[in-house]
Amino acid sequence: MNLNESYLDAEIPKGQLKHSKSGNFEGIPIVATTSEPTTSVNLDETFFKKAPIAMPICDDHSVSKSTSVNSLNTTSLASRRSPLQTKKLQAKNNLLSADLAKSNDDTTRALNSPKKDFGPYLDSENDIRSRLAESIYSMETSIRGSELQRRPYVSNEIPNVFKFSKFNSNCKLNESQTLCDKNFFIFTSAGKPIYCMHGKDEQIMSYTGLVNTVISYFQVNGPSELKTISTLTSGKRLTFLDKSPILLMAQSERGESSNELLNQLDFLYSYILSSLSERQLLRLFSKRENFDLRNYLESTDFENLDEICSLICNRMFPDLLLNSLQCLPFNHSSRLKLQNVVLQQLEKRQDIPRGTLLYGLIIAPQNKLCCVLRPRGHTLHTTDLHLLFCLISHQFQNLDETQELWVPICFPKFNSSGFLYCYIKFLPNDTHSNEKSALVLISAQKDAFFSLKSFSDELIIKLEEEKLLKKINTSKGFKLSDIPAPMVHHFIYKSKQNVQYVMPHFEVNSNIALDSSQGLEYELKLKTYYQQLHGTVVRDNGNLLSRSMLNFVRWSSKDNEDLAMDETQMDFSELDEYIIGNSSFKQESVNMVGMAWVTPTFELYLIGNNGIVDKRVLFKSARKVANWCQKHESRLFISDGAVF
């Protein structure tokens, strides 16, 4: 792939960086900031051993500013210590200084040795290259046996530079809306509340009257409808979507564009239509303008709205941002075999007239599209598929493989005035996993249940005979370590032709589960990085700035102060252990660089490891990612599907 490197800006001034020899690591420089003693590759003593600097503690027990120990007001603490405690602390400090000095001598002796000795960590430069090529992951021999296991040699967490992320993680559904940095409101043109993500009816009644007044004013006096109100000081943005007799409003302090918020509101409105249909909705309000729609909706509708809002706000959900589907990476020959089996089974069924089956889908766990059965020249809109996936994962996931559903669903982008009927059945799974794949057959005929059920039963038996069902359940996609692209923390690759995207597995630390609060916080951080990256290549109306562009975004923190500790909550023995055990304890500095690369055929959004600030290094890894995705395009994406 020939690339025009004129995209790249000028190199970062040399005074800010320190490069390794140009011949090492296939021309990739190791970047190290001059203000920090560790390399910014964050290899955690895997490649280079950091020598802590011994800093003596002053006589007045105050810590020197140049040391990496937390800046504590130890003068006031010393006044409260007894002479015995002070003497014990001085003895420990003397031992610490001696140990650190010895460590410095050992490290200096190793670095000045004429031999290329990399210590007990690596034996040669080849080891460095091979492990660096695996990004932040390496192979390690298991202690219990010879089986190789992948584990992160370093923490692959990314720093949090967004203040609202931690703030919003404590904001639960139906909590007071004043405590949250993002909220959704749905109400009628007459001011009747329908739904609010945070807050109760009493709390939002004041909003409805104000919003109706403002919207009505612009409808009468303005040249166009009101879409957004932004505040310059607080950064709060109010975005409106008028779908009379339904009005929707999003309140956000996250820096999202108007187009992003409008797409999210449209998705919520599409869900309401999927449950009612536009024709039925208009008929209800034509009889009475102040009709209370809450009395017509089911309790499951509000539960689904809660889940969708939580997915949009707090989870990594690039589907709406990129307006595309996530596809299950699957072996190309196995995918072709799967599509042929589906077509052959459909051709055998003479009792299913042409036009009875409109679409067929096999949806893998985590809402990843695996197979599509469709008529030639027709496809479903991504919004309709997103709604279907959300219903399956949130409302129907508790069903087992012996149960089946026949559900009327309105696909608003396909036909907002009518319903299609979906036969939904979860596929057998022998992998002892709670996540299940689903088979969905869509028809326009409400009496086609038994014919589609018979087709489904025969298809599942055939999939089990061909061992395709097991492959679907065990296919887990790919990891970042499968791609020879160093310095990359995470990426999203979108194929424009297929309107699909792929991304590697979330590989958080082994002691953090993705469904835990720390895992959710990680998803929210990653989501916000991508949101800001995407915002650099699109206009406020959602259109791309150009068909080809390359943008870099840098997040940095100039305030790299040492972590503070509350001295009122720490006794003297804890302070002694803290100083001895944390002589190099310092808050991680934020120095992140992300890249948004748009071409006529693909979009690539990539986040580098913290500390990698050389844009040419990151772009070289991005080219490897793009080449790898294009090389494995038949495995990563569904090009046509099973067409009949």
From Swiss-Prot:
GO terms for molecular function: guanyl nucleotide exchange factor inhibitor activity; phosphatidylinositol-3-phosphate binding; phosphatidylinositol-5-phosphate binding; phosphatidylserine binding. Changing residue 406 to A: Disruption of YPT10 binding resulting in reduced Rab5 homolog-dependent GEF activity toward YPT7 on membranes but not in solution. Disulfide bonds: none annotated. The modification Phosphoserine is found at residues 22, 71. GO terms for biological process: autophagosome maturation; autophagy; cytoplasm to vacuole targeting by the Cvt pathway; late endosome to vacuole transport via multivesicular body sorting pathway; macroautophagy; protein targeting to vacuolar membrane; protein targeting to vacuole; vesicle docking. Keywords: Autophagy, Endosome, Membrane, Phosphoprotein, Protein transport, Transport, Vacuole. It is a peripheral membrane protein. Residues 64-79 have a biased composition (Low complexity). Phosphorylated by YCK3; this modification inhibits the YPT7 guanine nucleotide-exchange activity of the MON1-CCZ1 complex, possibly by preventing recruitment by RAB5 homologs. InterPro entries: FUZ/MON1/HPS1_longin_1, FUZ/MON1/HPS1_longin_2, FUZ/MON1/HPS1_longin_3, Mon1. The YPT7 guanine nucleotide-exchange factor (GEF) activity of the MON1-CCZ1 complex is autoinhibited by the N-terminal disordered region of MON1. Inhibited by phosphorylation by YCK3. One of its GO terms (cellular component) is cytosol. Its main location: membrane. Residues 64-85 are annotated as: Disordered. Disruption phenotype: Altered fragmented vacuolar morphology. Pfam families: Fuz_longin_1, Fuz_longin_2, Fuz_longin_3. The disordered N-terminal is involved in autoinhibition of the MON1-CCZ1 complex guanyl-nucleotide exchange factor activity. In complex with CCZ1, is required for multiple vacuole delivery pathways including the cytoplasm to vacuole transport (Cvt), autophagy, pexophagy and endocytosis. The MON1-CCZ1 complex acts at the fusion of vesicles with the vacuole, through its regulation of the SNARE complex during the coordinated priming and docking stages of fusion, and particularly at the stage of tethering/docking. Component of the MON1-CCZ1 guanyl-nucleotide exchange factor complex made up of MON1 and CCZ1. Interacts with YPT10; this interaction has a strong preference for the GTP-associated form of YPT10. Belongs to the MON1/SAND family. This is Vacuolar fusion protein MON1.
